Amino acid sequence: MIINKPKKFGKKYSEIQKINFEQSPEIYIVNEEPSKAYFLKLFRKDCNPKKFSYKVKIHRKLNKKENPFFLKYISDSDAELIIREKYIVLEFAQRDSLSNYISGGNFLNEKMAKIVSWIVSKAIMFIHELDIAHGRISIKNIYLDRNYNIKIGGLDSGKMLDNVNKNKIKEYYLKDISALGLLLIQLLTGKDLFDSNFGNANLVKKAISDIKKGNSKKFWEIIKMNSDYNFTLELEELIENMFAEKISDMREILNHSWFSEISALDQKEFEKYKEELKSEFKKMEMNENNGDN
């Protein structure tokens, strides 16, 4: 039997496990020493050096600010003077991404979905205020750490907007907000709108496009045909505004009446809600483990 040796990255990092096989960048769990594990994103060798440096700059820019929302940047191949490889090392989230929890029909109740989407909304507002757009908010880029705190990854797809035209900046922000709408629906239904199991992706795109023209009827018909979740008029309005490109400021999202229950909480009360969310994720893990046995 052939046993492959763990991959080495630069002088510091050894492969523990490769966790994605179908996309670039490749993502590994690595360790620097037995007690320290990290995510390592390995980019193709032919990745344009300027593009790679740009990705690194986004992480370094964010790292200058104390924030609880994103996977912390640790290092990169340029900083370690490694020429033959291009990689970025990030904080390791032990519980993996939300896609492992919200899938196969699993979904969150409305209260829990509000907490997750509130935290993600605060995170998006945080980077928008730093003139950074994320560009790829999705369930696959939202992780849980050891204590079930939400940590967001995927920033290497981001865009720094310091010297970008104001109209263009708005476009980037609208894209993040629209992605938040898709995320919210997936949290509540357990289904990805553009997955083949949900329906025809082109019909969904057309229905979202119709929302921008003021017609949301077809969109909600598709949603209700493929989900048992009962969307309130208040929530429908919020999601429609996200897709209709009527909101470009995250504060409008956070101040929406659908979030009033969360926004009224003080920090101590909010921590209690987070404990409930932690319990919910633990239950999902137990159900998954029982299903495997």
Where are these regions (language model features)?
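Conserved short submotifs of the Hanks-type protein kinase catalytic core
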Residues: 83-97
